């Protein structure tokens, strides 16, 4: 199985080492493509890293009128191609996880591409290489999962919409679901280990993110 990322919210301590490291990635122009969010700011100080989930059927690419967002042979959803990007920001508004951000300085959508410049050379993404607690891991499914006491989940349910992702969330083994909203913060919607995608996410209304959609 191909290498991918595993996100374990229970291990995140909010140190933001991942954010600092992401800025150092040579293709990111000094911007971080990863965010650290509060799971439920009103009730806890628990945090979790938010990366691009690299959807199997990425809505950001589906809504792009210029075909500027590509998916490579390994299933990594890439940032928009500058010659094609129209500045329409459809991708920013359509992502159910609230990941893509619009860079107004260079007029381009930018997001996590799983450090393609590093992983293509056999290196871990910057965030996974510096995370002190293992909240962000990178490797093959059969290598990572047996070492954890948590359950990998990559099928997300937003109402009656199912979104399958390349990136896995690691959940407690006795939990069948975790609540998330449409912006990548764990509040208000359901994530389960369901297997089948059903309807197109584009049929759903996307909620406004409480994070800034621009750099």
Regions found by a protein language model. Give the residues of each.
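Non-ligating segments of multi-cofactor redox enzymes
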Residues: 1-215
